[in-house]
Design a protein with these regions (language model features):
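Internal/C-terminal transmembrane anchor helices
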Residues: 26-53
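Auxiliary, metal-adjacent structural segments of Zn-dependent hydrolase domains
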Residues: 97-164, 170, 174
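Pan-zinc metallopeptidase signature
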Residues: 249-322
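Active-site recognition of the HExxH zinc-binding catalytic motif
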Residues: 177-203
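Membrane-embedded alpha-helical segments of integral membrane proteins
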Residues: 1-20
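Membrane-interface segments at or immediately adjacent to transmembrane helices
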Residues: 50-120
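Post-HEXXH active-site segment of zinc metalloproteases
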Residues: 193-221
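Acidic/histidine-rich catalytic neighborhood
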Residues: 215-245
Length: 322
């Protein structure tokens, strides 16, 4: 419904001036009508979901102290993460790699795994600890109506605020489906920050008993880990980290990047990036689209706080990183 509403509103804005002209409505009245409609859309956006942008920040809401960065701590984090990434691949099994790069479909191999049930159960266990809305059984993911268009601007999922629907791109690969589902569900449960949504998606998927879901969690975090490592480490240190990753995972990662790059349109993508960057900055996310990669800082802060060892209802695999 959200997709139809947005498209319908845009079409109305384009068509209404011609309708008003034919009905001999004055320009002032026409503009006034459009402004009033947009005002109500604006109000609807915030009352339906947008007020989540004004929640207390993660550290203030959870009482967790923000970790001070140090090269040694980051190296420890990377060592633990790469070890768990490799382990999750081993437990998932080499045979899975054949369909990880297939598009997710309701009839494909990944559909036999109860992704929605596992992830919603995980969120239910940690909702109170992190100030999330506990997921209801009525929640259902919606497919994007224009997935091919969204792929051209690198959008794999989004939260539809007007009807509080979370939507997934129908061109998602099986390897990324569980993590992306968990990320968008986090938005549906009241989390506006992209870094936080990544954090909870990672915690839920990497704690799952199902090997394919667990690997999806570690694998989907790899891009953010790589980006931070390139920025914070020397080239020699960076290459040393990459060498520790199983070659099968590196190959899968490169194939995954190629899959989306072939669909991406640089011109359209840049416009979407600038618009969404401005949108985030205008809604209390000062770092804009860079907020996605800030998930690494949240994870390192959780490690220092030792949240994983104080009676957490989920046995988060991050314990091994401490």
């Amino acid at each position: 419904m959200g997709d139809c509403f947005i498209v319908g509103t845009c079409l109305w804005i384009l068509i209404y001036p011609f309708y008003a002209w034919r009905k001999r409505k004055g320009a002032k009245k026409t503009v006034g009508t459009i402004i009033r409609v947009l005002m109500w859309v604006y109000i609807w956006f915030y009352f339906a979901w947008g007020l989540n942008y004004f929640r207390f920040p993660f550290y203030e809401r959870t009482g967790i102290a923000k970790a001070a960065f140090s090269a040694e701590k980051f190296q420890d984090f990377l060592t633990g993460y790469v070890g768990k990434l490799n382990e999750s691949y081993s437990k998932a099994g080499d045979t899975l790699s054949g369909w990880y790069l297939e598009r997710y479909t309701t009839a494909g191999p990944m559909s036999k795994i109860p992704v929605a049930g596992v992830i919603q159960e995980g969120y239910g266990k940690m909702a109170s600890r992190f100030g999330l809305v506990e997921p209801g059984k009525f929640l259902r993911v919606k497919p994007m109506l224009w997935s091919r268009l969204m792929s051209r601007v690198a959008v794999t999922g989004y939260m539809g605020p007007f009807f509080t629907e979370f939507n997934l791109n129908q061109e998602l690969l099986s390897v990324e489906y569980p993590f992306t589902y968990a990320h968008e569900l986090a938005h549906r449960l009241g989390i506006a920050s992209e870094a936080e949504a990544n954090l909870y998606a990672y915690l839920v998927t990497s704690a799952a008993q199902e090997p394919a879901i667990r690997f999806s969690g570690y694998f989907s975090m790899l891009g953010y880990v790589v980006n931070n490592a390139r920025r914070l480490l020397t080239e020699e240190q960076y290459q040393e980290i990459v060498k520790r990753i199983r070659p099968e995972i590196v190959e899968l990662y490169n194939s995954h990047l190629l899959y989306w790059r072939e669909k991406y349109n640089p011109g359209m993508g840049q416009i979407q990036h600038q618009v969404y960057n401005a949108y985030l900055k205008g809604n209390q996310v000062s770092s804009g689209t860079k907020n996605y990669s800030e998930v690494i800082g949240l994870l390192m802060s959780l490690q220092e706080d030792r949240i994983f060892q104080v009676g957490s209802v989920l046995q988060f695999p991050g314990t091994a990183l401490l």
